[in-house]
Amino acid sequence: MRIILLGAPGSGKGTQAQFIMKKYGIPHISTGDMLRTTVNKESVLGKNIQAIIKLGNLVPDQLVIELVKERIIQYDCSKGFLLDGFPRTLTQAYAMEVAGINVDIVLILRIPDKIIINRIVGRMVHEPSGRIYHVTFNPPKQKGKDDITGENLIIRQDDKEDTVRHRLIGYHQQMIPIITYYNNANIRNIRCFTIDANCPISTLNEKIVRILG
């Protein structure tokens, strides 16, 4: 089972990716996680990526493609994988096809921008563990502190409102041709589904299971 999961930041993509990974036993490949890992290594590539992200811009196709190519040739992807947030441009989609990276299903999570902004702004992260909090929806027990370790929480640059709005504009511009591309991909035996994600997590889980079986 080879799946692409697409959706704007804050659409619930990460939560659903974890659900799919556990239920169907395939690895979750997140381009966001790979990029953050590269940034944390403080290499030249990591510093370049960090500068791009701080401006709220998307990382260039070629950089992301190279990271994904290295990941999907690993053994745990031999029986399937879940690509989270990739491809996000036509160049990336074409590069996947040229490289012989075939997928079976594309899931696109759709949710209004206003709701996405409310979800993301106010989000806080415990970087060592990846635990995520929100000042309104999931506040920590102690303000600004991780519940488990008591360590400080941070607000990522890409979770600030101006950055989120800028990213959403870029996301929509990129997604229109991507959606068209995969909706017309029936000749390559790719099934594409757009799912209303403005619903409780359990409801969204059920919608996805009905599609994947």
Swiss-Prot record:
Single GO cellular component term: cytoplasm
Which pairs of Cys residues are joined through disulfide bonds in the record? none
Q: What is known of its domains?
A: Consists of three domains, a large central CORE domain and two small peripheral domains, NMPbind and LID, which undergo movements during catalysis. The LID domain closes over the site of phosphoryl transfer upon ATP binding. Assembling and dissambling the active center during each catalytic cycle provides an effective means to prevent ATP hydrolysis.
Coiled-coil features, chain-numbered ranges: none
Q: Which compartments does it reside in?
A: Cytoplasm
* Tagged with keyword Cytoplasm: yes
Q: Oligomeric state and partners?
A: Monomer.
Q: What is this protein called?
A: Adenylate kinase
One GO molecular function term of this record is:
ATP binding
Q: Name the pathway it acts in.
A: Purine metabolism; AMP biosynthesis via salvage pathway; AMP from ADP: step 1/1
Native source species: Baumannia cicadellinicola subsp. Homalodisca coagulata
Its Enzyme Commission number(s) read: 2.7.4.3
